[in-house]
Amino acid sequence: MYYYLITLAVIALDQLTKWIVVQNMEIGQKIEVIPGFLYWTSYRNDGAAWSILEGHMWFFYLITVVVIGIIIYIMQKYAKGKRLFSISLAFILGGAIGNFIDRVLHQEVVDFVQTVWGNYYFPIFNVADASLSVGVVLMLVYVFVDDRKTKGIK
C-alpha cells in the first residue's frame, strides 16, 4: 500500500507546482533557473505529454479513466510483493491523475519545465509528465531485471 503514498505525493507536488506557476507567472513568461539549461516557462497544453494530439480533450478523458482503472487493477492484483513494479506503477498513476485533474478542471494542462540542450529546446513539461517518464523507465528496468531472473542470468 506504500505505493499509493508515492502516487499521492506525486499528485500533491504536481498540483502545488502548477498552482504556484498559475498564481505567479503570466502565460509565456520565462524564468531562468540554470543559465542556458533550465527555465520555468508558463505554458498551457490541451494535448498529451509534450503537446501530442492537442485539441482532442474527450479522447484524453476516456483514455485516462481507462488507464487509471487498469493501473489500479494491476497494482491490486499483480504488484504486491514486487517493489520496483509497484513503485513504477505508482509514478505512472500519479502522473496520469495529476494531468487528468488539470484536464477536468481547466480543459488544459499547466506545463512549466523547459530544458535546453545547445540549440534544442525540449518540449515544456510538468511534474506529472516527469513522473510518467520516471514510471516508464522504472517499469523497463523491472521488466529487464525480472526477465534476467526468470532466465537465471546474473
Curated annotation (Swiss-Prot):
GO MF, one example: aspartic-type endopeptidase activity
Cited InterPro entries: Peptidase_A8 (IPR001872)
A single BP term in Gene Ontology: proteolysis
Pathway per the UniProt entry: Protein modification; lipoprotein biosynthesis (signal peptide cleavage)
Catalytic activity: Release of signal peptides from bacterial membrane prolipoproteins. Hydrolyzes -Xaa-Yaa-Zaa-|-(S,diacylglyceryl)Cys-, in which Xaa is hydrophobic (preferably Leu), and Yaa (Ala or Ser) and Zaa (Gly or Ala) have small, neutral side chains
GO CC, one annotated term: plasma membrane
Location within or outside the cell: Cell membrane
Family the entry assigns: Belongs to the peptidase A8 family.
Protein name: Lipoprotein signal peptidase
Organism: Listeria monocytogenes serovar 1/2a (strain ATCC BAA-679 / EGD-e)
